[in-house]
Amino acid sequence: ICDLLTELGGDASVGEIDGAFCDGRYNVNLNGRKMVGTAQRWRQSGGRPVGLVHGALLLENHREELIAAVNRFNQACGLEQRVRADSHIALHEAFAAPDAISRLDGLYRQMLAQVFAH
């Protein structure tokens, strides 16, 4: 994902973003704002590490509604944390969707081919 964002002219990074919901050190960020949240679970199987890894990519700009829901939830749970819409960015805010999705698919397939070639 970072390769795609950089290829398209964005400033891609991985790490925490102040004010992001479900913040973590493996966020995928675009131009200093969170775009992808990730989660992973690792186990040993047959003497090697096996991971279940997934991400949630913000495609369209529904940040205000999303942030309002997260903040309502945090408040209802008695949590002090509040998140901010301007800490996030959607893919379509920065790049044309069909081109980006098609290229992401190609990069993913290329990565899988390399993984299974070794």
Please annotate each region the language model reported.
Residues 14-34, 43:
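Beta-rich nucleic-acid/ligand-interaction surfaces
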Residues 37-39:
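Beta-strand scaffold of nucleotide-dependent catalytic cores
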Residues 4-11, 41, 45-118:
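Long, positively charged amphipathic alpha-helical accessory segments at protein N-termini or as interdomain linkers
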